[in-house]
Design a protein with these regions (language model features):
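Beta-lactam-recognizing serine transpeptidase/beta-lactamase-like catalytic domain environment
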Residues: 92, 98, 273-287, 332-421, ...
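Acidic/histidine-enriched alpha-helical segments
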Residues: 150-170, 320-333, 443-445, 510-513, ...
Length: 831
């Protein structure tokens, strides 16, 4: 074997002498380098993958997150539109209110604090004196009404004690950062509380240098919100509806026109700091709110007030069990001038039913099946007593029923049998179809058989031979059954459908019932036709009746009723105007003229017929009464069917402009159920006030300068007394202090019976035992005759103008300041 060269020997020698640890270190360095390369590559991959996910795959999402953290997006609340009556009087508006709240955890002045030097723990103990002082001052301001009249607050009242305790308890919660002290606070009170808090903090500010705990501060703040206000309270409530706590329309016009009234909220987008607060930034982006539009109604507050007043009186006087309704509408355009359902509610506090609770409780218990208030077993069967009678639930919560009932607009949500009012429609069918004329005579023998049924007129009276006008005045069931037979089932149904009874009226209000109760053409047999002809076989809504009667007298046109007349912007500019919407012509003009004639014959001059009690001297009025049995309801305790008394009138009868309708659901008058006695006077009373107000054409008779002898009304029920005055052309006023209770009779009147007074004089009626009320005569000298008349009327006095009516008052027959009886005639001499 050849030996290595010297050079190779040297290399071999060196290799053999290498340190084993050095060889390991080399290998480790190689491995570490490789691992580092792998780690760097992997990390780079992870970073690249993350960047891909963040920047590309989920870039939009993360950019959105970043924007949310960096930007503050604030809502600009749109102002809800207002609701006005036809003359611009505000019925619903929105006001700024404030929620007053406190941060007790930051209100160090209300607590005594101590710090444990070892643990650093701070213990807070309520300071009763401070809490009492602050709670008292805040409560006084909350109840002052204006933030200033603190001395006027009765600190001994229950209201004060309740509010004080609520504030005290809220401020006592030392660990809470948010406690509500009051809601719906007006701006004056809010400013007063802010001023008090600022002054308090300034006066009590100090620091505990030793403990390092700041003392002497209370933290009270406010949050802006909006409140819906209804200045007239329980007035046209079923029409207006109300808004919920969040400001959304829940019922009535507030609901049906929600999108119109609400407007569109705006936004402000700006940068915010680390604490989430907005940074002043000239580059902030603002999207202005679009305020809601206003509704201008066809409703007239003066007509609505008259309708509600007389409806309330009638409900009380006749012990009406299931509420009442009234409608005044323009027969040519469908514009609703008044719509009332009573009792109703105050939309400012729609959840409250306490004012009507007793009435509502009786109503619910009168229809236990309808409201499901019987006790039930676990299997769903009813609990019964030993006699097998169902047992009422003594602990039932009926509040939901109470609210639902008082919220309902009775004119569109509830069905009833119209009874004899429907005879107007049957007459229109007969005349238009050529099956009858005004002079068509038919015989009423007192009983009439159809199949196996025998029909009678009221009181089983035989009216004998009569024409159409006489039959309507006599409200003869047998005449109209025979007329229905002449018309026939098929044609009768076609007219019934054309008059709108098989569909909604289309009124611009929510919750109009979609449930119609009538016989289809195929099921309208001879008995069903007979009952339908006089209004006892179909259930309809009051508004359906009004639109159908309007069509019968306005030339034959079925119009869509509406409450909203126009929509305006916040500056009053008209955005949309609602005109008459004629759906179709149902009968001819000539047939409509005939219906107007027979309806006027029903009322005549107030001396004959069931409609005479709706007569008002000086006006041509057509009308029809209807006393119907409610076959779809539980019977009364005496076994008789519950009744509805209704009356509809149109005027002037020769060319009607308005319709007035009143219905009383289940009246319990001790003397009668007849609508001619119960409902007709209510309609007449409404007409007596609104006809002059609307300028309705009179009958053309010049009564200026004529006098009327005042009738003796003492001993008459007040409603009958009013009828007597309407017929004679005298106005009437029920004394304010007198409640129109059932059976109330007139105990005093002024002017007295037998007095000769000018046509149109107001007679004051009293139903208590106090003989006469006095009033102070105002000084009207120097005033115009019209203004003087208004001043005297406001004082409860009648007026006679002597001399030049265009001049100023020179003398007055009763001295200014004198105390005289209300109703006294004061002669003013003008020149």
């Amino acid at each position: 074997m050849q030996e290595p060269s010297p050079k190779n020997k040297k290399g071999l020698y060196r290799l053999r002498r290498a340190d084993p640890h050095e060889r390991l270190s080399v290998r480790l360095r190689h491995f570490s380098f490789g691992a580092a390369v792998v780690f760097v590559v992997a990390a780079a991959g992870i970073v690249i993958h993350s960047l891909y996910n963040i920047q590309i795959k989920n870039g939009a999402t993360f950019r959105q997150y970043a924007a949310q953290q960096q930007l503050l997006d604030s809502t600009i609340q749109a102002t809800r539109g207002e609701i006005y009556d036809t003359s611009g009087i505000t019925l619903a508006s929105t006001s700024v209110v404030w929620t007053i709240w406190a941060d007790p955890s930051y209100s160090t002045a209300l607590f005594t604090s101590s710090k444990n030097d070892d643990t650093g723990e701070v213990t807070r103990t309520a300071d009763p004196a401070a809490l009492q002082e602050v709670s008292t001052q805040i409560t006084l301001r909350l109840l002052s009404g204006d933030g200033e009249s603190l001395d006027s607050v009765d600190t001994s009242s229950a209201a004060y004690q309740t509010q004080y305790q609520a504030v005290y308890d809220a401020l006592s919660k030392s660990d809470s950062a948010y406690q509500t002290l009051a809601t719906k606070v007006n701006n004056a009170i809010k400013l007063s509380i802010e001023q008090y808090v600022t002054a308090y903090n300034k006066a009590h500010k100090k620091a505990d240098a030793d403990k390092g705990i700041r003392k002497g501060r209370i933290s009270v703040s406010s949050t802006k919100s909006f409140q819906r206000d209804y200045p007239y309270g329980a007035f046209a409530a079923a029409v207006l509806g109300f808004c919920d706590a969040d400001g959304y329309g829940t019922y009535g016009l507030e609901k049906s026109y929600e999108s119109t009234l609400a407007g569109v909220n705006g936004r402000t987008i700006t940068l915010r700091n680390a604490y989430g607060n907005a940074i002043a930034d000239e580059n902030a982006t603002t999207y202005a709110a679009k305020d809601g539009s206003n509704l201008v109604l066809s409703l007239d507050v003066n007509i609505q007030e008259v309708a509600e007043r007389y409806l309330n009186e009638a409900i009380s006087a006749n012990n009406v069990e299931n509420r009442g309704a009234a409608i005044v509408m323009n027969v040519k355009t469908g514009a609703i001038l008044a719509m009332a359902s009573k009792p109703d509610f105050d939309p400012n506090n729609a959840l409250d039913y306490t004012a009507n609770e007793a009435y509502l409780n009786e109503l619910v218990h009168a229809e236990p099946e309808l409201y499901g208030i019987y006790l039930k077993n676990e299997d769903g069967s009813y609990v019964t007593d030993t006699n097998g009678n169902k047992v009422l639930d003594p602990e039932g919560d009926y509040s939901g029923y109470y609210r639902d009932i008082q919220w309902k607009n009775k004119t569109i949500t509830e069905l009833y049998y119209p009874g004899s009012v429907f005879k107007v429609i049957t007459a229109a069918m007969g005349v238009d179809s050529g099956k009858a004329t005004i002079n068509t005579t038919l015989n009423c023998s007192g009983a009439y058989g159809v199949a196996k049924e025998t029909y009678h007129c009221a009181g089983k009276k035989a009216h004998g031979v009569q024409n159409l006008a006489e039959a309507l005045r006599n409200s003869c069931n047998i005449y109209f059954i025979q007329l229905g037979q002449r018309i026939g089932s098929s044609l009768f149904y076609d007219y019934f459908d054309a008059f709108g009874f098989t569909e909604r009226t289309g009124v611009d209000l929510p919750s109009e019932t979609n449930f119609m109760q009538y016989y289809s053409k195929s099921r309208l047999g001879e008995v069903e036709l007979a009952s339908s002809a006089f209004g006892q076989a179909m259930a309809v809504t009051p508004l359906q009746v009004c639109t159908a009667i309007s069509a019968a007298v306005n030339g034959g046109y079925l119009v869509t009723p509406h409450v909203v007349d126009k929509i305006t912007d916040q500056n009053g500019n008209v955005i949309e105007e609602v005109g008459a919407n004629v759906r179709r012509q149902v009968i001819s003009e000539s047939a409509s003229k005939a219906i107007r004639q027979i309806m006027e014959y029903e009322v005549a001059d107030g001396t004959q017929g069931g409609g005479g009690r709706a007569y008002v001297a000086g006006y041509r009025i057509g009308g029809k009464s209807g006393t119907s049995e409610q076959l779809n309801m539980d019977r009364r305790s005496d076994g008789d069917y519950k009744k509805v008394a209704s009356f509809v009138a149109v005027l002037p009868a020769d060319d009607p402009e308005i319709l007035v309708y009143v219905m009383l659901d289940d009246p319990n008058n001790a003397k009668t159920d007849y609508s001619s006695i119960l409902a007709a006077p209510v309609v007449g009373n409404i007409i007596s006030e609104i006809a002059p107000y609307l300028g309705i054409a009179t009958d053309g008779t010049d009564r200026s300068g004529t006098t009327v002898k005042v009738p003796n009304l003492i001993g008459n029920e007040w409603s009958n007394a009013q009828v007597s005055l309407n017929i004679k052309g005298l106005k009437h006023q029920l004394a304010e202090s007198d409640a129109s209770q059932a059976g109330a009779v007139v105990t005093y009147q002024y002017p007295r019976a037998g007095a000769e007074v000018p046509y149109g004089t107001t007679v004051y009626l009293y139903t208590d035992t106090y003989e006469g009320r006095h009033t102070e005569v105002p000084d009207v000298t120097g005033k115009s005759a019209d203004f003087a008349r208004q001043m005297l009327a406001a004082a409860g006095l009648n007026c006679i103008v002597a001399g030049d009516a265009n001049g100023l008052v020179q003398e007055q027959s009763e001295a200014a300041g004198a105390s005289v009886q209300r109703g006294t005639l004061v002669t003013i001499t003008c020149g």
